[in-house]
Amino acid sequence: MKVVLQRVSQASVTIEEQVVGQINKGFLLLVGICDDDTEADLDYLVKKISQLRVFEDEAGKMNLALGQVNGAILSVSQFTLYASTKKGNRPSFTDAGQPDYAQKMYNLFNQKLAATGIAVETGEFGADMQVALVNDGPVTILFDTRDN
């Protein structure tokens, strides 16, 4: 499982000119699922993301977690995180999870995030989406459960 986390001051996702998810301070998550991902991978990332201390405290040090700053999450599915560009100029997406499995895992991931008490907004799995954000910092962190 791969997640690109961006600390944002605001973010939104639009489908067919309608905003379907929107947050102010928090994390924009671009979420990629592969067929090897398990519920343990979800649990690992939920714990890491919910406890990640990348918000500034009163001393200006990145020391506060999302819940401590009343932040929210905008979670957007993104199979292109599993693009392979080893051959040619057209990416291959064969490492991305099969749609039914990936959607099930993506939905479960978002439910588990919400169960931590953090407000979670989402895009729509498989849709053509426009994502707008203001990256705060910038702070961008890559997670890959194959590396843990």
Swiss-Prot record:
GO MF annotation: an example: Ser(Gly)-tRNA(Ala) hydrolase activity
Keyword Hydrolase found: yes
GO CC, one annotated term: cytoplasm
Catalytic activity: glycyl-tRNA(Ala) + H2O = tRNA(Ala) + glycine + H(+); a D-aminoacyl-tRNA + H2O = a tRNA + a D-alpha-amino acid + H(+)
Protein task: An aminoacyl-tRNA editing enzyme that deacylates mischarged D-aminoacyl-tRNAs. Also deacylates mischarged glycyl-tRNA(Ala), protecting cells against glycine mischarging by AlaRS. Acts via tRNA-based rather than protein-based catalysis; rejects L-amino acids rather than detecting D-amino acids in the active site. By recycling D-aminoacyl-tRNA to D-amino acids and free tRNA molecules, this enzyme counteracts the toxicity associated with the formation of D-aminoacyl-tRNA entities in vivo and helps enforce protein L-homochirality.
Record text about domains: A Gly-cisPro motif from one monomer fits into the active site of the other monomer to allow specific chiral rejection of L-amino acids.
NCBIfam families for the chain: D-aminoacyl-tRNA deacylase
Protein name per Swiss-Prot or TrEMBL: D-aminoacyl-tRNA deacylase
Source species: Latilactobacillus sakei subsp. sakei (strain 23K) (Lactobacillus sakei subsp. sakei)
Chain's gene name: dtd
